[in-house]
UniProtKB/Swiss-Prot annotation:
Gene, per the UniProt record: ruvC
Protein name, entry field: Crossover junction endodeoxyribonuclease RuvC
The organism's place on the tree of life at top rank: Bacteria
Keywords: Cytoplasm, DNA damage, DNA recombination, DNA repair, DNA-binding, Endonuclease, Hydrolase, Magnesium, Metal-binding, Nuclease
GO biological process, one term: DNA repair
Pfam families in the record: RuvC
Length: 175
């Protein structure tokens, strides 16, 4: 896996996994400076069987990774809800979202939804509108085509914010 550099610009992809729409957002971070690169979503047809939808997500993310060449990746963790089957299916999409960057040799960090909201908005229970408002401030050139792409940018921002402490922790333990 790619090491986490502490200095210099780093390109980060944030991924918001989902079976219907997997959002992705790419930014560059250097210190506190964030630069928007691109965002979008992978949307497999609903009528495909599960295995084909997962393949479409993988191929779509692989294309984004190849085109934008991020150095690090961050994926949102899945929260468990009352529908166990839906949670398991989302977990499969999340597995694909983690596998795709790993196949490119890119380290993958994970963040809880509340941590993403708290990092970007300042409140762990922020809504989609609050996230969108902060994205306009933090990444003024970004115009996410969907809430999933916006969430993916928020995940990338969260990683940019927390990666310094992660890199220092890894350095201390000798990784």
């Amino acid at each position: 896996m790619t090491a986490l550099p502490i200095r210099g610009p780093v390109r980060i992809i944030g991924i918001d996994p989902g079976l219907r729409r997997t959002g992705w957002g790419v930014i560059e971070a250097e210190g506190n400076r964030l630069i928007y690169v691109a965002c979008g979503s992978v949307e497999p047809p609903d009528d495909l069987p599960l295995s084909s939808r997962l393949l479409a997500i993988h191929e779509g993310l692989a294309s984004v990774l190849s085109d934008h060449k991020p150095m690090e990746a961050a994926v949102e963790q899945t929260f468990v809800n009352k529908d166990g089957v839906a949670t398991l299916k989302l977990g499969q999409a999340r597995g694909v979202a983690m596998l795709a960057p790993a196949m490119f040799g890119i380290s993958v960090a994970e963040y809880a939804p509340n941590q993403v909201k708290k990092t970007v908005v300042g409140a762990g229970h922020a809504d989609k509108q609050q996230i969108a408002m902060m994205l306009k401030i933090l990444l003024p050139k970004a115009e996410p085509p969907s809430a999933d792409a916006a969430d993916a940018l928020a995940i990338a921002i969260t990683h940019a914010h927390h990666r310094q402490s992660t890199a220092l922790r890894l350095k201390v333990v000798g990784v």
